[in-house]
Swiss-Prot record:
NCBIfam families: OM_YfiO. Part of the Bam complex. It is a lipid-anchor. A lipid is attached at residue 19 (N-palmitoyl cysteine). It comes from Haemophilus influenzae (strain ATCC 51907 / DSM 11121 / KW20 / Rd). A lipid is attached at residue 19 (S-diacylglycerol cysteine). This is Outer membrane protein assembly factor BamD. It is found in: Cell outer membrane. It holds the Pfam family YfiO. Part of the outer membrane protein assembly complex, which is involved in assembly and insertion of beta-barrel proteins into the outer membrane. One of its GO terms (cellular component) is Bam protein complex. Residues 1-18 form the signal peptide. Keywords: Cell outer membrane, Lipoprotein, Membrane, Palmitate, Signal.
Length: 262
């Protein structure tokens, strides 16, 4: 029993010593040492280790020449570890600290990717049991991020990919709205059905889901005895019956590279 206790104490002591030395490694290192270790870890794919050193670089030496690059590296490293909350915090901090940086486009792009990844479960689980109340805030925020990127930085290397992701998100959100309209139709909530499809026509007019929603809207108007509106809806359906909708695939994960501060 004494031997077991001794071994346990040795293990605890080793752990304490290890933590202490690791802490000193960060607390006492120079800004050059911290940044070098951080970037080396990043290149090796040791993202958690990279975050430890780069975070110390930005927090212990906030005015250093490495600040901008270290923050960009941290955005990337946190994204790779799927710490999405930290990514968004770092993006917000970067945008406020470096208002004139040409790398703002990268930061906004990463915010879009992060919000899209946060909402990815919504996309994957879309056609589950009952998704009528599924939260879509992250996907809508991602769309807004990409939209701002394309508007403010139209010539950035991220704009084309942002456009593709906007198309995918818009299609997914339209399908989500259609599912809600179907949900209401099953419960014969015809006013809610009509209102939902009207909203789809305003927000997602050029999607397949919205065209399919027109049939629900026509049915809703008929059930409510609104013959004129039902006939108008039929005219819209007929006018678009030959329209084709190309399938929109989910964009692949981008080949991300952290931009170099010049």
């Amino acid at each position: 029993m004494r031997k077991i206790k001794s071994l346990a104490l040795l293990a605890v002591a080793a752990l304490v010593i290890g933590c202490s030395s690791g802490s000193k490694d960060v607390e006492q290192a120079s800004v050059n040492e911290l940044y070098t270790k951080g970037t080396t870890s990043l290149q090796e794919g040791s993202y958690s280790e990279a975050i430890r050193y780069l975070k110390a670089t930005t927090e212990r030496f906030p005015g250093s020449v490495y600040q901008e690059q270290a923050m960009l590296d941290l955005i990337y490293a946190n994204y790779k570890t799927q710490d999405y909350t930290q990514v968004l915090l770092m993006v917000d901090s970067f945008l406020h600290q470096f208002t004139q940086s040409p790398n703002q486009a990268y930061a906004v792009y990463m915010a879009g990717l992060t919000n899209a990844a946060t909402g990815d479960n919504f996309i994957q689980d879309f056609f589950g049991i009952d998704r009528a109340t599924r939260e879509t805030t992250s996907m809508r925020t991602a769309f807004s991020n990409f939209q701002n990127l394309v508007r403010v930085f139209p010539n950035s290397p991220y704009s084309q990919d942002a456009l593709a992701r906007m198309a995918y998100i818009k299609d997914a959100l339209a399908r989500h709205e259609l599912e809600i309209a179907k949900f209401y139709a099953k419960r014969k909530a015809w006013v809610a059905v009509a209102n939902r499809v009207v909203g789809m026509l305003k927000q997602y007019p050029d999607t397949k889901a919205t065209y399919e929603g027109l049939f629900l809207m026509q049915e809703a108007y008929e059930k409510m005895g609104l013959t004129a509106l039902a006939n108008d809806t039929q005219k819209i359906i007929d006018a678009n019956k030959d329209k084709t909708f190309a399938p929109i695939e989910k964009p692949n994960e981008p080949d991300l590279k952290v931009p170099a501060v010049k």
